[in-house]
Amino acid sequence: MKNCLNICLPVLFAVFAVALARGQNDQNEIQITRPVSSLGNTRPIPVSIEGFDSEVTAILKFDLYVQGFTFVSPETAQYQISGSSTGSVVGRVVDRFGKKTLFSRSYNGATLRRQAHALTDDIVFAITGKKGIAQTQIAFKVQASNGNGEIYIADFDGHNYQAVTHDGTIVSAPAWAPGRSALYYNSYKRGNPDIFYHNLTTGERDDIAHYTGSNISPAVSPDGSRVAMVMSESGSPNVWVANANGSHPRKLTSTSEDSSPCWSPDGQWICFATKIHERRVLAKVPAGGGEVQVIRTPGTPNPTEPDWSPDGKWIAFTMQAGEFDICVMPADGSAPPVILVRGEDPSWSPNSRTLIYARRTGGHYVLSLLDVYTKQVKDIHQILGSDSEPAWAR
């Protein structure tokens, strides 16, 4: 890492104390307190942008803001970004403090938007040493007022969206297969909550889990060979694992009310939400079967919807104490969770820095991006209806 944001998330956990208090009506009230000690160097990177037209400038600012940058005058910027966008995008980045040019190049692409995204990713890599997210994709659910919905995919900022399904029924929980060529999701297309595999190249799809009861919450292993899911064929909803095509399902848990499985990036563990001794908790189980282990999340009641970061270090999840909040904790449990922002359904970016999540506003859901280090938030381009249950392609 090459700049002022080269800090580790443990700094955040070390300086936040999360206390759980009970109100007079036994209502859970979450209080976040910050000691006098500094949060660490979590300030955004100051950059200036000059020379581009208004469209490209807006794209660059959006892309960079949700990755920890802020915008100042050239005289006060740590990095100066300049260029042009007449016909194609040309960009140059100068380290004003180091007095050197980091790169200068031109871009080709179908649209100025795609060229601007490519420039953003080069800027992020040149300054931070990390891959950017501007050319990534997301999947999500768009729900109409009648409760039916469709699965959509889009660029990470919500642009260039397209519908994957056209079924006019209840859908949920899109999950990407590796390579961004296919999705798994839950659909009532055949009158039962089944899990479908959908090839995005050919448009073909298969109903891979259509057992008696519910078949929901698909999660694909990092190598794409297996899919975890929640099925209630045996009565209680439990975590199962099957081959990618749905064959040879194997029950992994016998706990109560399991939901929202996700994989560790090494494919060795499955994290999920469950109920033990009448309490909602997060737990993990070996992907090949074995003992269920509870993951402690002190100060964050009713945890659910976990997502394991691609670098293996963090678990983001939703907690509920009256309202829904997004939390992040070390995957090894070495520090308590930190409550970051109001929302639900968090999904990690491929570089384990930004979260996309759903937040409720004005009676519907919108998707927002959160830079975990700086807590900078931006709503993505609104699609149609109510947008929720995002999944980031990795």
Segments predicted by a language model, with ranges:
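A structural "domain/chain start" motif
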Residues: R22-F62
